[in-house]
Amino acid sequence: MSHASREYVTFFPYSNNKSCEEKNVRIMTATDITVKTLKTVSNDDAAYLASLVRTVPGFPNPSIIFRDFLPIFSNARSSRILIDSLIDALPVPADSIDLIAGLEARGFLFGPLLASRLGKGFLAIRKAGKLPPPVITESYMLEYGQASIEIESDATKPGQRVLIVDDLIATGGTAKAAANIVKRAQGIVAGFSFVIELTGISGMSELCDYPCSSLITMPA
């Protein structure tokens, strides 16, 4: 199954913040970031949303460029734009989704909001050790070791169609593990919805069996 088609428009953000630059934090430039063209979200709103995403080099270790999207939730306008955009960009029709599953931790910030707007339930995919038994556990490899995620063993009903959401896709390892755990719980993976897609990495290709969408693309 192929990805949902994605068209993007490059934009210039409102302004750079000198105080942020002095702290080794910068707001995106036009060569860094593109935003998906949407029918119901204006280019101005899309540009405003993306301008709130920060880049923090060297965090949490020197080899990482951290993409911080938490400022999007700092006001009602940007939160509304985010949910409107995610709904507009859904990779599958809303009526083909039964549950929204969010990955810990940042998928918990907007996953329930999206689920509420769509009239769906929410499934929390948690880091290992956070849920009482019985649970289903799925382990996967990271660049620096192994990690595990868990869901409650009765979190889905057989045949329920689950849209998995997260703030960012990089290598795709966590997302693929999320798909595996949903299937092990007898759910059906309806697709994936991401806020940010890092380019230059094979993340989306790891999910080529599922419809996928992302709102913002930027280099890894």
Language-model segments: residues:
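Conserved G/P- and acidic residue-centered "switch" motifs that form tight phosphate/ATP-binding loops
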Residues: D167, G172
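Short Gly/Thr/Asp-enriched flexible loops that form oxyanion-binding sites at enzyme active sites
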Residues: L109-L118
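Short glycine-rich phosphate-binding loop at a beta-alpha junction
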Residues: S96-E104
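Active-site-facing substrate-recognition patch
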Residues: I27-S96, A147
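PRPP-dependent phosphoribosyltransferase catalytic core
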Residues: I27-K39, D45, S51, K176-A220
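Short, glycine/charge-rich flexible loops or terminal/linker lids adjacent to PRPP-binding catalytic cores
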Residues: K120-L163
